[in-house]
Amino acid sequence: MGEKIYDTGFVLSGGGARGFAHLGFIEALNENGIYPDIISGTSAGALAGVLIADGYSPRDILKMLNLGSRLDFMRPTLPREGLLQISGIIKILNANLRAKSFEDLKIPLYVAATDINNGKAVYFSEGDLIEKVTASMSIPVLFQPVVISNIQYLDGGITDNLPVTPVENICKKIVGSFVNPVGYVEKLTGLISIAERTFMLNMTKEVTEKAGKFDLLVAPPELRNYGILDPEKAEELFALGYNTTKAKLRDETIRRKLDL
């Protein structure tokens, strides 16, 4: 067991556009005086996490990322290693990130990615930010792997979609936001839809396996009604994360755990 050197750790799952719900989750916590001392995120959680760690508020980030169209985030490419490019997200990070390295961030951050050469989860916490956040967000089939030091990396959700591992032994309290509930889908059409669905199904096991490690874990079931590649509902997703978290924070057992 490591020394619990941080008071509160935030853990943010992957989930594509559903990650806007993370921002509502954080907004509700902030209103109750709960701020992260360290953050661990995968994919969309890495994107939200790096901007929070850089000093932006949840509503700042909502405004920054709420562009309205998936084409503002990603572009079709020749399907050699991936169907899409994350060029829009890279552009947003280049334009807005004040920190250039993990060491420059205001809050310590872990970013989970999958080393596909060695078949394992990797938790980045040092060096260049943008390439490692991009690696964490590179959904297989949809996006090309990111090569760092001759190793190919894909989305952290392949191996760890709720990355509590880096912080579970060093935080007194851990709160988490999971945005990947999966419900019934009647029909899937097109390669991108099938790839998206397959990836999401692989990630659902995380909540049941790890729920006991959290003092508060928010996983709004209504998120199953939103696609992971459709950012058009950003305001709705933010509100869903916010309202679900506010409701959870009215529970006296949770309030005692969080010293509220």
Residue spans for each PLM region:
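Patatin-like phospholipase
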Residues: 1-42, 50-260
